[in-house]
Amino acid sequence: MIVPDLFVAHFREAAPYIRQMRGKTLVAGIDDRLLEGDTLNKFAADIGLLSQLGIRLVLIHGARHFLDRHAAAQGRTPHYCRGLRVTDETSLEQAQQFAGTVRSRFEAALCGSVSGFARAPSVPLVSGNFLTARPIGVIDGTDMEYAGVIRKTDTAALRFQLDAGNIVWLPPLGHSYSGKTFHLDMLQTAASVAVSLQAEKLVYLTLSDGISRPDGTLAVTLSAQEAQSLAEHAGGETRRLISSAVAALEGGVHRVQILNGAADGSLLQELFTRNGIGTSIAKEAFVSIRQAHSGDIPHIAALIRPLEEQGILLHRSREYLENHISEFSILEHDGNLYGCAALKTFAEADCGEIACLAVSPQAQDGGYGERLLAHIIDKARGIGISRLFALSTNTGEWFAERGFQTASEDELPETRRKDYRSNGRNSHILVRRLHR
């Protein structure tokens, strides 16, 4: 049973992310262990949904674990060099057989995901010789045999299929100009294709929850630099995963996400919720604070309106915001505005006021108020302000916990004192001395 209030709240939270992703390209690298049983069926249903939401999809699957299982069953030991599989002729043939079988399974699951709706549009799946490969050759004295690497991606042909509304399905295989077939590494291939298409997102669907920090906790968001630091302490596969992710980011991919594809709905949760469910890696930091500009005014007005209606903030007209936009800083998370604050200065005093500090109700637990306060304090120090005050009707305790002390109106600059007396709000006055 769907709880109506929860459904509405979640759908509203998802709306801006759905809008952001419509018409954008997503490349997914899929661990082959996810392409069987009920996990495959649920994944196919989610892929069908993403396609119908207007997201352009390229899916690339691996074959490593399938080949390892077959090698073990035949009494053979798989060999790897720098994390890449040495692919003999037998393994290549098995990879080709697996590619055909798993595509057929996925097609069936994709059709089954919309079969309950008589008028549901079809979700076409296409494959082709989009990838030209070459042999890796010899690494550290080891002949990699039929292990290959992408030589060229037919980007125009891929875009043609995506423009037509088709989902592109790529096996971990590529063909050379001499007519030979090579087994490709899924991690590297997905990153390479994502760069060629300048994809909005590259998603790696694995059997782990994401990238863990040294203390075992999940790293929810990482910059490329932070990810590389974690790679130094990670195991071989995680190190290769991070390396591929960073290569994609440096090649122009906007975001790389790593999540547990075995968790039901994980792809939807990662794409369409603010906090996601796995690890998200960007070239730069996710949360940023910047100077506001005129284009931010509608968003600032929408953010502070509920607080104005509750009497927590003083009403500010659009004209006021236009005239004072230079005082405002805004906090963004993943490109969305979640908070704002203003620093007011006074010509006759070495003090300033933090005003209009507001954080979106959807982000109250993110520590964004703390970040905005720290930003305003740094900004105030930078222009020589030694005292920062805040006027508050009901958040005085929050400021007191952060070093502000109760003060009298006599400590306000004269111009601010006049406003304080005339507006009738009788706000608490709090002051924090700023040490350089």
UniProtKB/Swiss-Prot annotation:
Recorded superkingdom: Bacteria
TM regions (residue ranges): none
Name this polypeptide is given: Amino-acid acetyltransferase
Keywords noted in UniProt: Acyltransferase, Amino-acid biosynthesis, Arginine biosynthesis, Cytoplasm, Transferase
Organism lineage string: Bacteria, Pseudomonadati, Pseudomonadota, Betaproteobacteria, Neisseriales
Gene3D superfamilies the UniProt entry points to: 3.40.630.30, Acetylglutamate kinase-like
Pathway assigned to this chain's UniProt record: Amino-acid biosynthesis; L-arginine biosynthesis; N(2)-acetyl-L-ornithine from L-glutamate: step 1/4
Entry's EC annotation: 2.3.1.1
Catalytic activity from the UniProt record: L-glutamate + acetyl-CoA = N-acetyl-L-glutamate + CoA + H(+)
Molecular function GO labels: L-glutamate N-acetyltransferase activity
Localization annotation: Cytoplasm
Note: In bacteria which possess the bifunctional enzyme ornithine acetyltransferase/N-acetylglutamate synthase (ArgJ), ArgA fulfills an anaplerotic role.
A GO CC term attached to the entry: cytoplasm
BP GO terms, sorted: L-arginine biosynthetic process
Family that this chain belongs to: Belongs to the acetyltransferase family. ArgA subfamily.
